[in-house]
């Protein structure tokens, strides 16, 4: 089968999985870290999807992937490429293989409870359906933890696990059959709770230690402020580049005083792909007042806050000078052209009043 034919379906599946992810807790508290796994799969290969595929994220940065066909964990972050022989990686690979098996069993259970399979004389033939799972944990600055485990079926919320009660919350009536079946097996519920409250936080701490050992204590190597023009007006953008860990605070100052939060767009922080991060903060300003504003950055790797301001570059001054010169020259030549045309008009009128006499 042509794999390219399943690409649109794969993109749709990823979109559905992101929708499922969006309802999981993602706004990390300052000093917190997270470990998340996204599982997805299709019941039939005609969708161009594997039976099981897994993506692992630490602090929202992809670091491992796995699929049912290869049955191998693949490193997806530069800082973990050389660690595939470590004990942590071997444990991670074994966990993903176990989840592969459990995912397929759960998939068949859910489809059976939905009557989404056809029974023939020879075998049970499943219909085409999609299962998504998100699970993981967070370790907060005070060393407390929280976990989550959710199932989505055909793009809709299905079940969510509650570690405190060991129960499953059904998102729709047809999920009750699976809920009751899973809650009868208390061993599974206790194992799920132990993973979220013990194993997952331990693994997260190990991954973070490995990441820090490879990257070291990165700090913003460059903080700069740039000016931008648009149809909506003038804005300043503050950029902090190549820092680690992810936690960073960026704020705008006007005349050395912090601006009200309601006047500032929220900061954006994204991974670079090499284990470090970049962040930026924008602010709309009135033309001519750019120099009154400065950007202040705080980061664990800095001894004190770092402040940067916008400064016009020489190239910008040169461009402005050239544009001004061209404008003045254009006005000058237009003025000369108008004078010439006016003189020609006057001369043309005089010539029009003069009549040549006929030759005798």
Curated annotation (Swiss-Prot):
Residues 311-319 are annotated as: Connecting peptide. The keyword Hydrolase does not apply. InterPro entries: Ig-like_dom, Ig-like_dom_sf, Ig-like_fold, Ig/MHC_CS, Ig_C1-set, MHC_class-I_related, MHC_I-like_Ag-recog, MHC_I-like_Ag-recog_sf. Binds to transferrin receptor (TFR) and reduces its affinity for iron-loaded transferrin. It holds the Pfam family C1-set. This is Hereditary hemochromatosis protein homolog. Residues 1-25 form the signal peptide. The keyword Transport applies. Residues 26-319 are extracellular. Residues 220-309 form the Ig-like C1-type domain. GO terms for molecular function: beta-2-microglobulin binding; co-receptor binding; signaling receptor binding; transferrin receptor binding. PANTHER family: HEREDITARY HEMOCHROMATOSIS PROTEIN, MHC CLASS I-RELATED. Residues 26-127 are annotated as: Alpha-1. It is a single-pass type I membrane protein. SMART domains: IGc1 (SM00407). Belongs to the MHC class I family. One of its GO terms (biological process) is negative regulation of ubiquitin-dependent protein catabolic process.
């Amino acid at each position: 089968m042509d794999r390219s034919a399943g690409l649109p379906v794969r993109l749709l599946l990823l979109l559905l999985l992101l929708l499922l992810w969006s309802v999981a807790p993602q706004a990390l508290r300052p000093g917190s870290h997270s470990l998340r796994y996204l599982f997805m799969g299709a019941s039939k290969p005609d969708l161009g999807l594997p039976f099981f595929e897994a993506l692992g994220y630490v602090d929202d940065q992809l670091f491992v992937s796995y699929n049912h066909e290869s049955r191998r964990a693949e490193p997806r972050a530069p800082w973990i490429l050389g660690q595939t022989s470590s004990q942590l990686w071997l444990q991670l690979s074994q966990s993903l293989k176990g989840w592969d098996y459990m995912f397929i069993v759960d998939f068949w259970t859910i489809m059976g409870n939905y009557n989404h399979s056809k029974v023939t004389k020879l075998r049970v033939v499943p219909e085409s359906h999609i299962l998504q799972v998100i699970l993981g944990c967070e370790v907060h600055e005070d060393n407390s933890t929280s976990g989550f485990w959710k199932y989505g079926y055909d793009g809709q919320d299905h079940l969510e696990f509650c570690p405190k009660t060991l129960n499953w919350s059904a998102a729709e009536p047809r999920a009750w059959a699976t809920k009751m079946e899973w809650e009868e097996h208390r061993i599974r519920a206790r194992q799920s709770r132990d993973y979220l409250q013990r194993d997952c936080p331990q693994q997260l701490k190990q991954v973070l230690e490995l990441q820090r050992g490879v990257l070291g204590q990165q700090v913003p190597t460059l903080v700069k402020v740039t000016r931008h023009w648009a149809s909506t007006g003038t804005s300043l953008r503050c950029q902090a580049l190549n820092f680690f860990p992810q936690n960073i605070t960026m704020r705008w100052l006007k005349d050395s005083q912090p601006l009200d939060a309601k006047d500032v767009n929220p900061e954006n922080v994204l991974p670079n792909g090499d284990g470090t991060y970049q962040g930026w903060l924008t602010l709309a300003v009135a033309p001519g007042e750019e120099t009154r504003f400065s950007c202040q950055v705080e980061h664990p790797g800095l001894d004190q806050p770092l402040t940067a301001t916008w400064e016009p570059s020489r190239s910008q001054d040169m461009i402005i000078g050239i544009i001004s010169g061209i404008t003045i020259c254009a006005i000058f030549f237009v003025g000369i052209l108008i004078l010439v045309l006016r003189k020609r008009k006057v001369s043309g009128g005089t010539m029009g009043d003069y009549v040549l006499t006929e030759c005798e």
